Curated annotation (Swiss-Prot):
Its main location: plastid. It comes from Sophora flavescens (Shrubby sophora). The gene is N8DT-2. It is an enzyme of class 2 (transferase). It is a multi-pass membrane protein. This is Naringenin 8-dimethylallyltransferase 2, chloroplastic. InterPro entries: AtHST-like, UbiA_prenyltransferase, UbiA_sf. GO terms for cellular component: chloroplast; chloroplast membrane. Involved in the biosynthesis of sophoraflavanone G (SFG). Can use flavanones (naringenin, liquiritigenin and hesperetin) as substrates, but not flavonols or isoflavones. Shows a strict specificity for dimethylallyl diphosphate. Its cofactor is Mg(2+); Mn(2+). It comes from the Eukaryota. Keywords: Chloroplast, Membrane, Plastid, Transferase, Transit peptide, Transmembrane, Transmembrane helix. It catalyses: (2S)-naringenin + dimethylallyl diphosphate = sophoraflavanone B + diphosphate. GO terms for molecular function: prenyltransferase activity.
Length: 407
């Protein structure tokens, strides 16, 4: 007994089972996908499936198919696949199910792309910074309550939204530059489309402002708004904007955004909205703003050293292009060493013994480690300079750990 599954060709076919012969008419039409004829014979529990796959071009092809009971021939068939299968139960066609491993692989790739898009070295630092800036408002151990934890989570959500908006807008405005300086970024490499990055960036802004509004914290709302406006002024290429072209405006943008706005905003959110205390500006807050301002200047200047090639091509006159990478490198190192020296002197005046010891000893260690790395850095290697830039971010993170301990 013969079982025949007709192929999905447009037109009629004459099928003869008694004579063990199937003849198909000639077709002279344009096809843009491969078609196949499947003939199944059931004999002693065995199924023989024969596929004749035809790749049709945009030219007219005449194809003749002749399918016999014992075999299959094709006069003008470019590819032929024969599959022998043995089955004793069912001869019905069953669609292939999706491989869960492939689905998980796609999800994993998407998460990895988003992870790279967010620049993990920076997002870790900003979240840690927001955490320790929130701790500045803690006056006693009893302040570390559930209310503090909820307020801290609110700050973390806000700062992540700010960060994603910042990096997203930067990549949107610097696509061509990043293809030279940072070709591994998702947008520059093509792993993320321009449209998707626009959606992610706009969503982070809306989510940040909406979240702060729902929480009912005006310090948090204005922190998100002002930080995003500084990010736009720094990146967007419009009249009076695109501050990254000018070293002084770049430094001002980083100080105002990272040091002043975030330090004050997160502290006031915890102080007034979480702890319900009057607005004050304690000594740790002033120290936090001052030391983070130095780091903001150093990061703003140093980040352009590995990016000189792309900046020069697109007319961005960074300080590294004006003074040279070596001079800017040692300016950044000197600024950090001076900041550590001043911090050691100020920390020594603390009336609290444990705060005095931690502040002096901690910054002395940071200063020593920085000097050791600076002396062994090859200033002619762009890879080494990029590595040193990552090292500055690590120092920045370590500084955040010391800030709440300054009293």
């Amino acid at each position: 007994m013969g079982f025949v599954l007709p192929a999905s060709f447009p037109g009629a076919s004459s099928i003869t089972t008694g004579g063990s012969c199937l003849r198909s008419k000639q077709y002279a039409k344009n096809y843009y996908a491969s078609s196949y004829v499947t003939t199944l014979w059931h004999k002693k529990g065995k199924i023989q499936k024969e596929y004749c796959a035809v790749i049709f071009s945009r030219h007219n092809l005449k194809q003749h198919y002749k399918v016999n009971e014992g075999g299959s021939t094709s006069k003008e068939c470019e590819k032929k696949y024969v599959v022998n299968a043995i089955s004793e139960q069912s001869f019905e066609y069953e669609p292939q199910a999706r491989d869960p491993k492939n689905i998980w692989g796609s999800v994993n790739d998407a998460l990895d792309t988003f992870y790279k898009f967010c620049r993990p070295y920076a997002i870790f630092s900003v979240v840690l910074g927001a955490t320790f800036k929130s701790l500045v408002a803690v006056e006693r151990l009893s302040d570390l309550s559930l209310a503090f934890f909820i307020g801290w989570l609110q700050v973390v959500v806000a700062v992540i939204c700010i960060h994603i908006f910042d990096v997203g807008l930067n990549q949107l405005c610097d696509i061509e530059i990043d293809k030279i300086n940072k070709p591994d970024l998702p947008l520059a490499s093509g792993n993320l489309s321009f449209r998707n990055v626009v959606i992610i960036t706009a969503s982070s802004l809306i989510l940040g402002l909406g979240f702060a509004w729902i929480v009912g914290s005006w310090p948090l709302f204005w922190t998100v708004f002002i930080c995003c406006m500084f990010a736009a002024a720094y990146n967007v290429d419009l009249p009076l904007l695109r501050w990254k072209k000018y070293p002084v405006l770049t430094a001002i943008s980083f100080i105002a955004n990272v040091a002043v706005t975030r330090s004050l905003g997160f502290f006031l959110h915890m102080q007034t909205c979480v702890f319900k205390r009057p607005t004050t500006f304690p000594r740790p807050l002033i120290f936090c703003t001052a030391i983070v301002s130095i780091y903001a200047i150093v990061i703003a200047l140093f980040k352009d050293i590995p990016d000189m090639e792309g900046d020069e091509k697109f007319g961005i006159q960074s300080l590294s292009l004006r003074l040279g990478p070596k001079r800017v490198f040692w300016i950044c190192v000197s600024l950090l060493e001076m900041a550590y020296g001043v911090t050691i002197l100020v920390g020594a005046t603390s009336p609290i013994l444990w705060s005095k010891i931690i502040t002096v000893l901690g910054h002395a260690i940071l200063a020593s480690v920085l000097w050791y790395h600076a002396k062994s850095t090859d200033l002619t290697s762009n890879v080494v300079l990029q590595s040193f830039y990552m090292f500055i971010w690590k120092l920045h993170t370590a500084e955040y750990c010391l800030i709440p301990l300054f009293r």
